Every structure is written in C-alpha cells, then in structure tokens.
UniProtKB/Swiss-Prot annotation:
Its main location: mitochondrion. Its EC number is 1.14.15.4. Its cofactor is heme. InterPro entries: CYP11_CYP27_families, Cyt_P450, Cyt_P450_CS, Cyt_P450_mitochondrial, Cyt_P450_sf. Heme binds at C450. Pathway: Steroid biosynthesis; glucocorticoid biosynthesis; Steroid hormone biosynthesis. One of its GO terms (molecular function) is corticosterone 18-monooxygenase activity. Keywords: Heme, Iron, Membrane, Metal-binding, Mitochondrion, Mitochondrion inner membrane, Monooxygenase, Oxidoreductase, Steroidogenesis, Transit peptide. This is Cytochrome P450 11B1, mitochondrial. Belongs to the cytochrome P450 family. GO terms for cellular component: mitochondrial inner membrane.
Length: 503
C-alpha cells in the first residue's frame, strides 16, 4: 500500500543531511518574539479518517516512527497530528521535554490504554499506576516508590536479579562448551524472554518459575502464552475506539480478555502464596517487592495486585528488545564489545561479592544501554495531557492538549548526537553535564517516569555483565534491522547471534 511504500523509502534514505539537521536542531533559537497561536502550528497533511481506516485494515501502524520522523524533517521540530477524532502535538527536542516537566501538575496526566482499561472495568479489577490518572494515581504512586523505585529498594532486589542473570549465563555457556566447536548460533530472543520473566517474577513475588536452565511447568508456559496473546491483541485494538472495534474485532476482544484472565489468575496465585507465608511468620529477611508492600499495608491487596500485574506485563518486551539489540550492536562492533568485556572483568570480583556494585562499577556498560535506547527506544513516545497553557517552539499550547515527545527522532537528531547512526556508548560519558538531562528519557520524566525502571535496568545490566565476561558475541548480519511499531518499537526479525567461548 501507499503508506507502506512511503515508509520503506523513508527508512532507506539518510536521516537528513547535516545541513538540514543543523537547521532542525537550532530552529528553536531563531523564532519571532511574538508567541504564535496554536492554529498557526504546522499540521501533518492527510485525511485523519482515511489514516484511521488504513490502520484498521493493516491491524496496526508499523511505520509510525518513520512517518513521524519524515514529518519532522519536512515541517520542523513541532507539528499537529490528527488521527480519527483525536489530535495531538508532536515534538522531538530535549528542551520541550524540560518545559513539559516544568508545567507538570501534582497529578501528571497521560492517555489511558483502552483495551487494558476495558478489561479491568469489565472484570471489576482495579487499575495500577500505569493506567490511572488523578489523585488515585498519586496515592498509589507515592506508596509504591519506596519498595519499587527507590535506591534502597534496588539494593534489596538486585541480588535476586543477579542470581537469575548468573543462571542464564551459565546455561548459555553450557550450550556453548557442549558443542564441539565451542560455539553456538541461535535466535536468543526466546531465551531472553524467559530470563526477563524469571527475573521479574523473582523480584516481584519471590518465586522461581524454572524458565532459565530448567524445564518450565505447564502453569508457567500458560502464563507465557497469555502474555504473548495479550500484547498481540493490544496492538490490534489500541487504535480503534472500543465502540467500533467491539463490532469489527469481537474475536480479538475475546482473546484479549481470556489472556488477561490467565495473567490475573497467575497473579492471584502468587499473592495468595505470599499471604499464606506471611500469616505463618514474619520473614526475617527480604523476600520480594510484593511481600514488602503487603507487610507495609499502605495499599489494599487489590491495588497491590493491580500494580504487580502491570509491572509483570510491562517488564517483558520492554526489557527483551533492548537486550537483544544491545547484543546485536556489540556483535557488529567488536571493539566496543571488547571494551565492555574488559570493564566487566575488572569489576567481576567486586560485583560477585556485592552485586549492588554493578550499578556503579560498570559505567561503560550503562552507557551502552543508553546508546541502545537512543537508537531503539522501546517506548516510541512520551506523552502528557498538559494541565496548563504553555509555549513550545514559540507556539501557544492550550491546557488539555495531548503532547507527544517522539524519542526515535530525538535520538537520531545529528544536531544533538553527531553521527547518530553510529553505535558509540562513549558519547554518553562525554556529554554528561548541565543542559543534557533530557537527552536520555526512554523511561519517561518527572513523577510519571516508569515505575519499573530500576528493575528493568538491573535485569539488562546484570545479564550483559555475566554474558560478556565469558562469551564472545558475533553475527554475520551487518545491515540494520528494520524496526516496527507494535505498541512498542521492536525488531521485525530477530538476528541470529553466535556465542563463542573465550579462552
């Protein structure tokens, strides 16, 4: 179709010439003094309803990141974008992220994910902080932060993640050494998928599922399948109002609800086990995030379940694909890989004794994860429904407007990141300083930043640390991997990677 053909051409072309990039990156400093009205803002051309119809026909919007990227090149760093009956403002410069944070209210608002909310309303379940807005969101968030996001919380659950990362590395090394050539070539994505669920489940509920290096139970496999169906059906339903999609896609809605039923049943079972253990005796040591929340009793059990389900669902693909793309980029950039290996080996003894030191003793590896998320932001955009009037790029933005920050375009702007197509973790160690706080915002900003951010960072950091100490990663694929938008930004195909033992 025309949409797909246009996207292919856009992807094949260079991001934009350096001259045009400089103009785009600095245009914000060359604006008239008089603030322009909202109606004067450039608007993305095209019929809003035909665009929505095309999304429905294609069951998604795979090339959203490329189309928006192209529109920034054509219209500048801000424009209006209409889709069906909804409208939004699109921006892509760090200074606009900063301004959005400056006008955040006590309860920063973003759009809800209708398929997820519809399920919870239909089944009578509470929503967690990912779906909530208003005072209830703030009430939940302030009581979750100490046990999920705070530095103290990270220090407590990080050794649990480290244990799973070690098991993953050992299982992969075992496969390698059992091969006569001391190497193995495979699609590593399913194994990483199992790892993230295992690590998240242990940190959240204090229970191993046997997904890493063991044979998983039938209940674990059913849970995995439900997660996959839930994500797939979310993409098929998220662009169309439920009042319409309930007639056009009843089968998908049925699959979506059944998948969530399985996920919530799994969560119920985990929480009931923790309840029973706490009823017998108070634990003498840290056991899990959910156990701490139940012991604190500042949130109702239903609210704890709702938030733990969101953390479980949100911790899977959002961690899997950055890990996969980091391994792929390291395979394509052996010099970078070797530098990271040397750093991990130098810190190995210290981290082995105190896993918490991984957060401070692996600066280049942390920079590599930043570089991956710059090129491949798993969350394509950040959003706010602004609570008060503000000015972005010299245009008046009225209260109640939906503003989206497109991270794909922010990260590939040559005015911000010289040679943006190059995978160069060192750039993050070189650009630290004032004025750069909003260059790296893949987990959001302000009070609404991702609640599971520290857990995701720990899972990625520790897996890479343990794998790189012992294994060389290689690939025959030197071409860029095509990315598609499917609720999150993900690779359209998974590269084959070769893991080779290091003598």
């Amino acid at each position: 179709m025309a949409l797909r053909a246009k996207a292919e051409v856009c992807m094949a072309a260079p991001w934009l010439s350096l001259q045009r990039a400089r103009a785009l990156g600095t245009r914000a400093t060359r604006v008239p003094r008089t603030v322009l009205p909202f109606e004067a803002m450039p608007r993305r051309p095209g019929n809003r309803w035909l665009r929505l119809l095309q999304i429905w026909r294609e069951q998604g919007y795979e090339h959203l990141h490329l189309e928006v990227h192209q529109t920034f090149q054509e219209l500048g760093p801000i424009f209006r974008y209409d889709l069906g009956g909804a409208g939004m403002v699109c921006v892509m410069l760090p200074e606009d992220v900063e301004k959005l944070q400056q006008v955040d209210s006590l309860n920063p608002r973003r759009m809800s994910l209708e398929p997820w909310v519809a399920y919870r309303q239909h089944r009578g379940h509470k929503c967690g902080v990912f779906l909530l807005n208003g005072p209830e969101w703030r009430f939940n968030r302030l009581r979750l932060n100490p046990d999920v996001l705070s530095p103290k919380a990270v220090q407590r659950f990080l050794p649990m993640v480290d244990a799973v990362a070690r098991d993953f590395s050992q299982a992969l090394r075992k496969k390698v050494v059992q091969n006569a050539r001391e190497s193995v070539t495979l699609d590593i994505q399913p194994s990483i998928f199992h790892y993230t669920i295992e690590a998240s489940n242990l940190a959240l509920f204090g229970e191993r599922l046997g997904l890493v290096g063991h044979s998983p139970s039938s209940a674990s496999l059913s849970f995995l399948h439900a997660l996959e169906v839930m994500f797939k059906s979310t993409v098929q339903l998220m662009f169309m109002p439920r009042s319409l999609s309930r007639w056009t896609s009843p089968k998908v809605w049925k699959e979506h609800f059944e998948a969530w039923d399985c996920i919530f049943q799994y969560g119920d079972n985990c929480i009931q086990k923790i309840y029973q253990e706490l009823a017998l005796s108070r634990p003498q040591q840290y056991t899990s995030i959910v156990a701490e929340l139940l012991l604190n009793a500042e949130l109702s059990p239903d609210a704890i379940k709702a938030n733990s389900m969101e953390l479980t669902a949100g911790s899977v693909d959002t961690t899997v694909f950055p890990l996969l793309m980091t391994l792929f980029e390291l395979a394509r950039n052996p010099n970078v890989q070797q530098a990271l290996r040397q750093e991990s080996l130098a810190a190995a003894a210290s981290i082995s004794e105190h896993p918490q030191k991984a957060t401070t003793e692996l600066p280049l590896l942390r920079a590599a994860l930043k570089e991956t998320l710059r090129l491949y932001p798993v969350g394509l955009f950040l959003e706010r429904v602004v609570s008060s009037d503000l000015v972005l790029q010299n245009y008046h933005i009225p209260a109640g407007t939906l503003v989206r920050v497109f991270l794909y375009s922010l990260g590939r702007n040559p005015a911000l990141f010289p040679r943006p197509e190059r995978y160069n973790p060192q750039r993050w160690l070189d650009i630290r300083g004032s004025g750069r706080n909003f260059y790296h915002v893949p987990f959001g900003f302000g009070m609404r930043q991702c609640l599971g951010r520290r857990l995701a960072e720990a899972e990625m950091l520790l897996l890479l640390h343990h794998v790189l100490k012992h294994l060389q990663v290689e690939t025959l694929t030197q071409e860029d991997i095509k990315m598609v938008y499917s609720f999150i930004l993900r690779p359209s195909t998974f590269p084959l990677l070769t893991f080779r033992a290091i003598n």
